[in-house]
Each structure stands twice: as C-alpha cells, then as structure tokens.
Amino acid sequence: MNFYARTTAVVLLGIFINQPIWAQTFKMSCELEGVIPALEDRKLKPEKVVVEIQTMGKNLFMKVVGTNFYTVQASSLTTEEFIGKNLTSEKLMGVTRKHKATGFESEVRIERETVMMTAFNDMDYRGKTVRVLLSGPCIRP
C-alpha cells in the first residue's frame, strides 16, 4: 500500500470512529392538561405534545415537546449541573432530575398499562418558583 492510500484509509477511519453515536428516539403523542397550583390552581389550555424517549447505555432520557409551559426535560443522567434518577418499574417508565444550583426539579412518568402521562416542571414565574403539573393520555404509535 502506498503512502497516499494509507493516509486516506487512516483519515476515513478517523472520521467514522469520531462520529457521535445517537440512540434511536421513540416518539409518542399525548393530549395534556396543565395546572399551576401556586397561582390559585390556574389551568392551562390543553395541548397536544410529543414525548421523546431515548436510552443511551444505562441512562433514560425523556422530553416533552410543547409550548413554553408544556416543555419538560428529564433524564437519569447525573452531571455537574443535574442529579438524575431512573424511576422505571414494572408499572411505569419515568425519570426525574434536579438542578443542583437552583433546586428546580422536573419529572416525567408514563404508566405502562394505561399510557397516562404525568409530569411536572419547576420554573421561575415573575420572580417566584412555581411548579407546572401536566397530565393526560398518550397514544401508542
């Protein structure tokens, strides 16, 4: 093998080895209703959202994709910023995380049998920490 062929092979091998490995994302639609108990049980307009579920190694990642109040992200991964925990059991799949600096928590749970989702997300609302509670049925794809 000449120098050019070896160099090309090494460069191509390096490109393929350094590509990030992404887990396949499972998506599911849900019809959620939200409430903010700290604001006199203020009800939010119901919304259709998409729940994205991924696993990477032993970690579970769940993300509710919707508008401002209907966006929740949690994972079992523990990092410098977050403490994560896998809540998955025979009855449900879920994760929770807590931001170390702010104490804000978020959680997503989906009941296996009924495919009902419950979630919450702490957020700052006009200088006050409030918890947005979400719940509703999901549709299996």
What is each model feature region?
Residues 27-65, 91-111:
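Short, solvent-exposed loop/hinge segments that bridge or flank secondary-structure elements
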Residues 19-23:
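Sec/Tat signal peptide C-region and signal peptidase I cleavage site
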Residues 116-120:
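Short, compact, well-ordered microdomains
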Residues 1-9:
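Bacterial N-terminal signal peptides that target proteins for export
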Residues 121-141:
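Edge beta-strand at a domain terminus
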Residues 34-37, 63-73, 122-126:
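Short, solvent-exposed aromatic-acidic interface loops
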Residues 8-18:
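Bacterial N-terminal signal peptides
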Residues 65-104, 137:
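Contiguous, well-ordered beta-strand patches that form the walls/edges
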